[in-house]
Amino acid sequence: MALSLLSYNVSDLCLGKPPLRCLSSSSSSVSDAIAALKSSEDTFLSVWNCNHDDDNNTECECLGKISMADVICHLSKDHDHSLCALNSSVSVLLPKTRSIVLHVQPSCSLIEAIDLIIKGAQNLIVPIHTKPYTKKKQHNDNVSVTTTTHSNGQRFCWITQEDIIQFLLGFIAAFSPLPAMSLSDLGVINSTHTVVAVDYHSSASAVVSAVSNALAVQTSVAVVDGEGDDPFTSLIGEISPMTLTCCDETAAAAVATLSAGDLMAYIDGANPPESLVQIVRNRLEDKGLIGLMSLFDSLSSYSTSSGYSSEEEAPVRTTSYGRSMSSSARMARKSEAIVCNPKSSLMAVMIQAVAHRVNYAWVVEKDGCFVGMVTFVDILKVFRKFLENDM
């Protein structure tokens, strides 16, 4: 039965997928990206090298993807010139490597798609055929965000690691006995030495670097309590880029000033504790970070910059420091880590990760000892080897 999967291609995974919304790398700024992300139901937006406001025959190419977490990391690093950083080209938010987003044809086989994901791709861009489309402007005319439509009417969607895992779950019986086997027996656990982790008391600079690294590999930052010679004894929680995507740009001030433990508390739930809000403000003042201070206090920056006359007219407004109303409504997540143990079955971990919309799960022993992490890529490697042996 597993051999029947060889007949599927990525077009089978595109059914029901909405066309991508995009930003132009040549005409969009970081500020545009913030407005677009706040008004979008999507966590990520694609960035392209063609300007969809112009009617030309230039071949479109997706350069990468961005989220609010990318914005927050960018602003927290450039804290001396935060307001200027908002006017930078959106391209500064893109990762240095272009290989994480790849164009493929609809005829690309499922096996080929899995191989690309294993080699490092995070999203596969696939052309889709839809009815003729008339581009509609955003309510904010200063933001150039459209559904990706080329001059020949071509539009695109993308396939993620999660899409492939969900598709394989529909054929899980074909991989017997793998689904019932434990993580330890399958050897898919990444040790603590290979995961992105920081100590609970780590400084803000260490946190910024760790979050950036986790973004690049599409995982998360483990917050640990180190004891003795082993700095990664127990897992306390995580700082997830997916949690940061629920925040707004003012969270950059918290990332730039708080320790790992305090940042976990700040982004946990809907509203940060007032005590932490005051700590962030005090540290911004102590360090003379005027740019971040101005950003931190601009709670209505999006509504104001967009020129809306009232809160009712604005598609998104900020309800509290660091938290976006639309984002928290569609993906409210606490910083509590998603965990399993080495004896958890492969299928249980897959379902757990998919249910929480993450690409990984932390692995912890029953006594609380931190073991490591298992990712969707690790799981896909197991399935790929199984299919290879069956071919």
Curated annotation (Swiss-Prot):
Transmembrane segments: none annotated. PANTHER family: AMP-ACTIVATED PROTEIN KINASE, GAMMA REGULATORY SUBUNIT, CBS DOMAIN-CONTAINING PROTEIN CBSX5. This is CBS domain-containing protein CBSX5. Keywords: CBS domain, Repeat. It holds the Pfam family CBS. It comes from the Eukaryota. GO terms for biological process: cellular response to hypoxia. The gene is CBSX5. Residues 16-81, 331-391 form the CBS domain.
